[in-house]
Amino acid sequence: MASLPARRIRNFSIIAHIDHGKSTLADTLLMRTKTVKERDMVKQVLDSMDLERERGITIKLNSARMDYVASDGELYVLNLIDTPGHVDFSYEVSRSLAACEGALLVVDSSQGVEAQTVANVYLALENDLEIFTVLNKIDLAGSEPDRVKQEIEDVLGLDASDAILASAKANIGMDDILERIVQVVPPPRDTANEPLRALIFDSYFDPYRGVVAVFRVMDGTMKTGDAMKMMATGATFAADEIGIMRPDKVPVKELGPGEVGYIIGGIKSVADARVGDTITLSKNPAAEALPGYSKSVPMVFAGIFPTDTDRYDDLRESLQRLQINDCSLSFEPEQNSAMGTGFRCGFLGLLHMEIIQERLEREYDLDLITTAPSVVYNVYRTDGTMDSISNPADLCPPELRERIEEPYCRLDMIAPSDYVGTLMELASQRRGEFIDMTYLSETRTSIKYDIPLAEVVTNYFDDMKSRSRGYASMEYAITGYRQSDLVRLDVLINQEPADPLAVITHRDRAYSIGRQLVDKLKELIPRQMFRIPIQAAIGNKVIAATSISAMRKDVTAKCYGGDISRKKKLLKKQAAGKKRMKQFGKVEVPQDAFLAVLSVDGAAD
């Protein structure tokens, strides 16, 4: 199969918020162009993981090639490059968009513009994509196309007057969308004579064939059997097989400029074929790589421990397998007095963390305990060195540190105007700094805050949803590090520090968090034969304390009357025994106490 002339290729992606109908629209387009036969159709055909189909989100990217005969009688190839919609995967989104020339902005005509839509549209504009609007779910009773068109123009500054009214479910407007793709999306430049440069926008591990890299040819031509080289990682390999996705793989001999395909060449690890890297020929390499490549850096860390310590090796093996497919996941062994042995894992964000945990439990049948998520702090020492830490136990003593910096992010919440007050209160409680408020329409508002990432990763999303009755949506982007007055809050149980319960928090919030911690532990730790003091302390200074009173055995029960000195002797002996027990007694803290403490959200009382 010869490669197609570039003027007949259209590369596009679909931008949408979760639940606005992106996957259903993709399914309908695949059926409309007869790329997928109706009998082979599964819902959300491009979402290959069960987890994606259940949650209705796109995690891993997929792409599909459709053949379409337009109204001008010409055959066009439409490459749909799917993008994940969630902020945790924004780097993957940006690389997918870099492989396109155009984008469909899909907005639910009953809901309107949401936070993630805004973020992804800005990414598309940064990549100079031609954007046109599709108002989906037009068949619903609550559909308000005129209001939503106005909102798109006001919020995003895009002309929505010629937006296509469609319903992917009811098959309305699909031909209009296909025609608009051909007319509006620019064809790729014809650069067949230049040295090969292909942009990897996805890669995954196939247990039988090694790493499969999905790419778009930017310049030059790729042929089966060519010796290839990755420009960022330097890995070299032979192109054993190249092909196109319909969405299943179909091998071809060569791919020209603008075409989208996959390559298999015995690559052993996804780390050698990273998203954003450039493929070129070993013999005739390109002078420079395509711009925009960066290594994904974990922003959120948490400890993952097996409930059964015998399954530690299974957990390690499962994490290694997931890492083959997901090089943004990092992990290292961690020993913990309460949980035993496990791993300290790094994730791109909270959704990434939830997905990894759920995949470990579901695909590898593991029972896991996950500790509270934390972020990476930069600790500057007095001797001029800098440590990046994510575990409170690694924080050096106050006399050795000059300052601590924590990551901040720009948070954008979009919500009905009725909930603005309560959402602003939540953001201020979480140390947010108000930046801007915009009325998107009479009923919907966008509120922007600069807020520490540590506050966002601890239950912020749940609190926002409960305060707005589920109507608010949010998006955040890391803006950099700032100096903060942070302290390490230790918990002492019977004078012994309980390391797993230590947290890094802001000094102003330390008292309320300490108070919540000690009160919660008092409820959960079983009573002993001696009094157990529970304290929250910063360094040597106790800021909150409580105690669990001792259980008392009635040692005088057998003395019926008789001499009082006998009772005194027994009570004295009991007191001495308790004193000795307090000195040598160990307090066993149950695991559910640790888990319950993880739910302390630290919102100021």
Swiss-Prot record:
The residues the record assigns to binding GTP are: 16-23, 82-86, 136-139
One BP annotation, GO: positive regulation of translation
Q: Which GO terms describe its cellular component?
A: chloroplast
Q: What is this protein called?
A: Translation factor GUF1 homolog, chloroplastic
Report the function annotation for this chain.
Promotes chloroplast protein synthesis. May act as a fidelity factor of the translation reaction, by catalyzing a one-codon backward translocation of tRNAs on improperly translocated ribosomes.
UniProt cross-references to InterPro entries, sorted A to Z: EF-4, EFG_III/V, EFG_V-like, EFTu-like_2, G_TR_CS, GUFP, LepA_C_sf, LepA_CTD
Q: Name one GO molecular function term.
A: ribosome binding
The record lists the catalysed reaction(s) as: GTP + H2O = GDP + phosphate + H(+)
Keywords per UniProt: Chloroplast, GTP-binding, Hydrolase, Nucleotide-binding, Plastid, Protein biosynthesis
